[in-house]
């Protein structure tokens, strides 16, 4: 799991989604307005993936409702994904979806995800692009405090034990 909780409100959920996408190498924008054929719409998280050719576009809808998201909301999002020409649509809900919602997105590029499913979808990429490099950076910072080649000799010397001739000259 990347993040424990989806946040306390919908704005927090949007920011957490954008953070995960950014850590995966995407370029997210929170609350972006898009002009479509039917008018201007507000997209919770708009992201492009510069690692693909051409860059893929992801549109995310984030709901932190107490109830399950109804089918009509999912239908409206699916239409926005189609009108925008996005490659992927992720509808992320903290409390799931009503049963008919899944039929609306069948055979489309729209994915209905709870918070855990969204994280699982990006977990491998997040580990590869963010977590492992972060661990390497931490390890590199600690490397100056560790001398694996001479540590055994340094311990013996600190305890007053005699050093072998090669150790005495640092070989």
Which sequence ranges carry the predicted segments?
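Mixed-charge (Asp/Glu-Lys/Arg
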Residues: 1-171
């Amino acid at each position: 799991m990347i993040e424990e909780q989806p946040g306390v409100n919908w704005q927090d959920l949007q920011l957490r989604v954008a953070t995960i996408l950014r850590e995966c190498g995407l370029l997210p924008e929170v609350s972006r307005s898009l002009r479509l054929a039917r008018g201007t719409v507000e997209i919770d998280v708009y992201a492009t993936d510069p690692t693909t050719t051409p860059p893929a576009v992801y549109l995310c809808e984030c709901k932190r409702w107490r109830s399950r998201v109804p089918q009509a909301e999912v239908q409206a999002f699916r239409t926005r994904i189609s009108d925008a020409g996005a490659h992927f649509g992720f509808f992320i809900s903290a409390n799931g979806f009503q049963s008919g919602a899944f039929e609306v997105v069948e055979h489309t590029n729209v994915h209905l995800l709870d918070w855990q499913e969204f994280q699982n979808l990006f977990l491998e990429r997040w580990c590869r692009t963010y977590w492992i490099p972060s661990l390497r950076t931490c390890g590199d910072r600690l490397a100056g405090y560790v001398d694996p080649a001479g540590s055994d000799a340094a311990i013996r010397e600190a305890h007053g034990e005699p050093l072998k001739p090669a150790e005495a000259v640092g070989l």
